[in-house]
Amino acid sequence: MMKNRLMKGSLAALVSLLATNAMAAQEVTVYTAFETDILAKYKSAFEKDNPDIKIKWVRDSTGIMTAKLLAEKNNPQAEVVWGLAGSSMALLKDEGLLKPYTPKGLEDLHANLNDPQSNQAWFGNDAFFNAVCFNEAVAKQLNLPKPTSWEDLTKPVYKGHIAMPNPASSGTGYMQVSAWLQNMGEDQAWNYMRELDKNIAHYTHSGSKPCVQAGMGEVAIGISMASRGAKLKTQGAPLAVITPKGIGWESEAVGLVKESDAAKRVVDWSISKAANELYVEMYPVVAHKEVKATVSNFPNVQANMAKMDFAQMGSKRAEILAAWSEKFDAKSEPKS
């Protein structure tokens, strides 16, 4: 009897150990376009609150990640998409890649950053904005005036001194191209981009890179992310972060691809107050109603925000990118 009890006890302990190990080994594949330098912090915070789940990040810029998800449509590899532009999420939903879901805590979010349709499938994390990063030290050396409008950037004095994200690779680039098209009108916007292209040194495949290059003095001007400009300026880069009237902006969002319990818990946590308290360290506008903060050196964006139609950005994406690539892709940097 004693031997049987010992065997049963050992067996129960073994089953418990195996179950614990199985839970510890549970991994969720998350596709993202969040900036690389914040991924470790988000992963660590989530896993601290959910020790039985591990996040496996797959990261690329918005355009490349959107194309990857569409290419995998018939055999999805992602379980969650977290930190991708709202216009891309709208497109993914239209293509049947995102599952309708009601995450815990949805009522605590600002509704204007979420999927506007009744069968909601994506939910805002933050809003991100474009800006012009202007290196004042380089400008002084080259005698370049400080630009105050988009039209200023077409002046011959800036020839070869501007970097901008390729919109086919970067959501930051695509949302600014969309802002020009939606607010200038298509004919005027394409004419504007032709004039701007004369002054472009190169197009990057990262939304933050033009501002990083401006901060390092590799170019004088980078059309880029306002949050990156603010961060670099706070770190000591000689930058002015300029917001011309009609700056592009968009929500960054999360959505469910596979309906596992673990994937749902990632989505739930991503809209939580704890997650939003991390977002606000970089983004001054976040989805949670109770989370507000001031980001050092972040420009006043509200007065100069373009009117943005995110559904149109999603539906016209392929058409716009094909036209842009045909006209301007020759100046793009090589893809790494």
Tell what function each PLM region has.
Residues 187-188, 287-336:
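An extracytoplasmic/periplasmic, membrane-proximal ligand-sensing/linker region
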Residues 25-90, 212:
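Early extracytoplasmic/lumenal segment of secretory-pathway proteins
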Residues 133-138, 178, 250-262, 270, ...:
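A bilobed periplasmic-binding-protein/Venus flytrap-type ligand-binding module shared by bacterial periplasmic
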